[in-house]
């Protein structure tokens, strides 16, 4: 939920000035795009394709909202409603990030392909350029805990105020939590090839590789964030124990980081048809990359933390096909090293948060069975079952709060939060006519952990959808869809402010109010698409 008045005060990270953000500032975005798609068939059998696109978004803004913890306050704590009356009861700490950006990119891909006997060859070239000019500002606020929350104000001392005089404010904690800034570009120039080799009528081998020259040049602010953080030379102020005002000098300026690296990827896939309908398949892929420009918008990796990200994937299984069924069952292993993430850690029972830079690994072993079923004319069913176990590796962090207390989080070998171990998809569709179809979609998400240390979790739940699509003619399409058909209620995702809660401490929160995301309620949507 957001502030009712539609606007709020914040500290601009770039200018260091207090400004007002209106809700529409995050909606009025603009982008222009032009594309060229072409191909040419040579007489000698080679096929040439060229795809090019240029996009410019001079305004690419959006707003993020998050929560922290829920606590109970008394009138003596000084919280007031907008009419000036004192408030007592439950409050939720709220967090907001305002993202302001300008983006442009130019993408070019050209390929040559040809069938040579039992080889299907393809060689291609990528030239991808991306430019980003981006910053974000953050602040905190408090809302009442009720059906229609109201914004609260309280006494706040701005660390940029040399008099250290308290004033009433609805927003506070300016730029303490992960404000971001970067400006620069990245360029990817790559050469790649693939070969689909039909060794025998029953045995097929597919392999390929890609080599990429990657250049990134970005402005980065590696300094830790704090209340009142912004670019420039300035002072923050605090009151000492003896009542004197202490000034602290800051000089915050971006520094350029330039990297020239080689990324690579390779893949190998084998398929063997035991019979005309049944077969075996296996494949292995490895892909690498170095940190992207977007990962320098925060404090970014240091030189010691700048490492290659490696993503290996290995899987194998069986498949079966006939006139009405296409079935496959695969076991998959995948991992990813050196993930870069900024994690906001909240002190349990309070709304105080700190941001830390984390570099960690993820790996998962899973089994997926999927089926495409066409039992009778005009009816199609997609079905999927997945069991997986995604876990964190090398996930350790510690943070020191304002009272001097240091707390740590250790998520090693813990299940990745927000990712269920069991997934089920059921998607039936019936084509009433050539241009009119009805569809349903059922999604089951199994038990899902809501924090990093497996202390809190949500039970499994179903999400349901349905609708009708009508292609009126080549220019007009109409549709109606229903979300949450059975109006299921509940929570999902994560629980705000729970990052540092351990399994041993989870019992303390039984019967306590906590905040997070809820299932989208029963909704009916109508849509129309017009093509010229």
Predicted stretch roles:
Residues 309-316, 380, 414-532:
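Conserved C-terminal beta-signal and adjacent last beta-strands/turns
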Residues 201, 326, 333-337, 357-452, ...:
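Gram-negative outer-membrane beta-barrel transporters
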Residues 103, 118-120, 126-128, 180-336, ...:
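Structural signature of Gram-negative outer-membrane beta-barrels, strongest in the C-terminal barrel
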Residues 41, 47-53, 273-281, 285, ...:
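Membrane-embedded beta-barrel scaffold of Gram-negative outer-membrane proteins
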Residues 18-63, 92-126, 130-136, 174-204, ...:
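Outer-membrane beta-barrel transmembrane strands
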Residues 54-60, 116, 127-133, 211-217, ...:
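Transmembrane beta-strands of outer-membrane beta-barrel pores
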Residues 45-48, 118-121, 202-205, 277-280, ...:
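Repeated loop/turn-to-beta-strand initiation elements of outer-membrane beta-barrel proteins
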Residues 1-37, 59-97, 152-179, 184, ...:
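Acidic/polar loop-and-plug regions of large Gram-negative outer-membrane beta-barrel proteins
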């Amino acid at each position: 939920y957001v502030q009712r008045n539609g606007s709020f005060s914040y500290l601009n990270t770039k200018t260091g000035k207090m400004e007002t953000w209106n809700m529409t500032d995050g909606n009025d975005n603009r982008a222009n795009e032009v594309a060229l798609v072409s191909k040419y068939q040579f007489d000698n059998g080679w096929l040439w394709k060229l795809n090019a696109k240029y996009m410019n978004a001079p305004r690419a803004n959006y707003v993020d909202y998050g929560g922290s913890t829920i606590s109970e306050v008394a009138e003596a704590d000084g919280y007031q409603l907008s009419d000036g009356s004192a408030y007592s009861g439950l409050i939720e700490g709220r967090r907001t990030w305002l993202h302001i950006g300008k983006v442009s990119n130019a993408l070019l891909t050209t390929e040559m392909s040809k069938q040579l006997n039992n080889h299907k060859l393809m060689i291609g070239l990528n030239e991808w350029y991306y430019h980003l000019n981006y910053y974000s500002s953050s602040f905190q606020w408090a809302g009442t805990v009720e059906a229609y929350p109201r914004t609260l104000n309280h006494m706040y001392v701005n660390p940029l105020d040399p008099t250290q005089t308290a004033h009433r404010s609805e927003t506070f904690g300016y730029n303490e939590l992960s404000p971001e800034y970067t400006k620069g570009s990245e360029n990817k120039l790559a050469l790649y090839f693939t070969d689909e080799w039909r060794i025998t009528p029953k045995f097929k081998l597919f392999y390929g590789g890609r080599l990429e020259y990657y250049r990134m040049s970005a402005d980065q602010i590696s300094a830790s964030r704090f209340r009142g953080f912004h670019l420039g030379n300035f002072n923050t102020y605090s009151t000492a124990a003896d009542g004197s005002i202490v000034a602290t000098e800051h000089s915050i300026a971006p520094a350029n980081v330039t990297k020239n690296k080689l990324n690579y990827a390779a893949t190998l896939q084998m398929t063997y048809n035991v019979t005309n309908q049944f077969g075996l398949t296996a494949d292995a892929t490895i892909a690498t990359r170095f940190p992207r420009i977007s990962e320098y918008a925060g404090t970014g990796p240091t030189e010691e933390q700048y490492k290659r990200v490696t993503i290996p994937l290995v899987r194998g299984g069986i498949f079966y096909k006939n006139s009405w069924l296409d079935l496959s069952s695969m076991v998959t292993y995948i991992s990813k090293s050196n993930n870069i993430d900024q994690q906001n850690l909240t002190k349990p029972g309070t709304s105080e948060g700190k941001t830390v830079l984390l570099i960690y690994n993820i790996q998962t072993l899973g089994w997926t069975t999927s089926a495409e079923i066409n039992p009778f004319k005009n009816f199609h069913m997609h079905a999927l079952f997945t069991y997986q176990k995604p876990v964190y590796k090398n996930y350790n962090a510690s943070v020191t709060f304002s009272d001097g207390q240091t707390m740590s989080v250790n998520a090693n070998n813990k299940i990745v939060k927000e990712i269920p171990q069991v997934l089920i998809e059921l998607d039936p569709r019936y084509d009433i006519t050539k241009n009119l179809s009805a569809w349903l979609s059922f999604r089951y998400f199994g038990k899902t952990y809501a924090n990093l240390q497996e202390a809190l979790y949500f039970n499994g739940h179903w999400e349901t959808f349905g609708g009708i699509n009508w292609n009126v003619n080549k220019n007009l399409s109409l549709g109606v869809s229903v979300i949450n058909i059975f109006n299921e209620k509940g929570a999902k995702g994560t629980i705000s402010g729970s990052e540092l809660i351990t399994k041993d401490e989870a019992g303390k929160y039984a019967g306590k109010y906590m905040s997070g995301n809820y299932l989208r309620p029963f909704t009916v949507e109508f849509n129309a698409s017009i093509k010229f």
